[in-house]
Amino acid sequence: MELNLSGKEINEVVTSIDDILGPSEQRYFGEGYKRTQYECNINYDKDSAQGLVSVAYRTDWSQKKTQSRRPHLSTIDAFLIAGRVSYAIIKRHYKLSAHQSSQAWIRHVSIKAGAEALEDLDAVRLSAQLLDTSSSQDSLFGTLTRVKTKLDSMEIEVIIDHEAEADHSQSVVSFSDDDEYFNSDFRLRHCHLANNTFCDAICAVSSDLLFQCPGKPSTGAMGHYPNALMMVDWLTCFAQLSQLVMYRLDKLDRNETHNLWMRSVTVTTPYPIIPRRKHTLTLRSMKNSLVKKKGSSWRLATVNGSVSGHPEFNLTAKLCHQLPQGEPA
């Protein structure tokens, strides 16, 4: 489903998202996530994996009122870890060549958080299992494989579009999970949201995505598409649009807010998009409510996101955040 604001009353247009949320260098979904470090100690079996993951945030990962915030395991962390492990499992199962591994594409991601945000990040338990493989005519390479990863109480399902037949003319890729995208290349990409256009009547915002990347050759996962928008790009952009919508609902300044918690998120990206100068993203709150929890007021919302010109691309997420003290529910 493609959302747009055509024919709707526009309430406000803000040139740069930084003018609303603050400098991207001080925001997690701006540049802060790129400063996170991961140490993965994973053991692989036939179609599964288990181990421990350490996630280290710098103190300046996200700042509000010049103070650092306490981090929790984010959707970005969950995707990067689960994506890395899912690729490693599929490479082993199908004995993919280096070329086959680099052109395999992450088509779908679904992330569900536990009952509470996970803040103990020194030794997060990981388990992963290849669930199933199916043939698909509506895919790039004819085969879709689903892998489920658990990070403590968080669950992540990744669907990868890939070739099923081993390419014996090519050397089999190393079975390490040291793919450049998951380790370093995601940090080299830059997304900026401009011309942020608000329609309060339907709780929606549309923004132009301006994208820059080095386009350098990459080895391992999705290395065949160095200029394409990747899952982290989509997740961080839609997360920022979610912040715009959530804060506007209660007329909040980001400096006054608590961390935004994505309770669940599902993203479908069926093929690589090599971006034009810009793409228009739209996010809308389909429903929202205020509730009381342990004496505090919380805003809950369900949002849908879309990409102009690509109706097959979509995002659905359930979000919440605690309102500042004094805001009634």
Question: What does each of the following model-derived ranges do?
Answer:
Residues 71-74, 227, 231:
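Alpha-helix N-cap/helix-initiation motif
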Residues 76-89, 231-246:
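Short, structured motif recognition centered on aromatic/hydrophobic residues
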Residues 1-20, 123, 127-183, 280-282, ...:
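HotDog/MaoC-like acyl-thioester-processing domains
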Residues 65-77:
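DNA polymerase sliding clamps and clamp-related checkpoint/processivity subunits
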Residues 86-132, 244-286:
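Hydrophobic beta-strand-centered segment that forms part of the acyl-chain substrate-binding groove
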Residues 1-66, 159-229:
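Non-catalytic linker/capping segments at the edges of enzyme domains
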Residues 78-81, 109, 237-241, 265, ...:
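One face of beta-strands
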Residues 58, 68-71, 86, 169, ...:
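RNA-interacting cores
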